[in-house]
Amino acid sequence: MTARGPEFRDVMAHLNSGLRNAFNLAPSEPVRGVQSWSGDDDYKVVVVSGSGTAAMEMVIANRFRSNDLVLVPTNGKFGERVAEMCQRFCNVKHLKYDWGRAFDLYELERQLERGCYESLLICHNETSTGITQDAAAIAEMCARHNTSFILDGITSVGGMPVHPTEWKAEAVVVGAQKCTAGPSGIAAIAINSNFIERVHAIRDQGDSNPNY
């Protein structure tokens, strides 16, 4: 099987369609020759030949300008990894909670009321401490304050309710080796039209970070 042959294209069509189901997105036809990564909604799925961390870095590197300010609350190792990646590509307000302590939603609301953040990014299911963030409540806050919402769902997609459309998440990342019980070294991203338009605008204006 070659990467450009019809058999591989059939595999990718079925993979794209299955991923849309895992992300709770509108279904697509698992048929070669159609846009199996798109459905009857605002999202596309992208398969990544790399880890969940690589996929998350792709999202961050392509979505933000170097002078954008993002808000990243953390309460464990993997959230802190998201904050560290953001520090390489944009400006970060890092709300660092004690490991194992839930986010203070009132504090997040107060931060978003400042109106200075381009995006809020969270690790949905923080496996280093066993804490799952209230993504629905945080997404609602982001919508109220016109702040984009990006979700590291590496260990939540396929294992607990994740609703990109309802949450208006610009991007959600999953790692194949976690809840979907696939091989390590493969990841996927669900992105909406706002994310895609922003990436193109940044690139067209010559402000992009080194991108993937």
Model-predicted regions and their roles:
Residues 1-58, 77, 81-85:
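Conserved N-terminal alpha-helix of the aminotransferase class I/II PLP-enzyme fold
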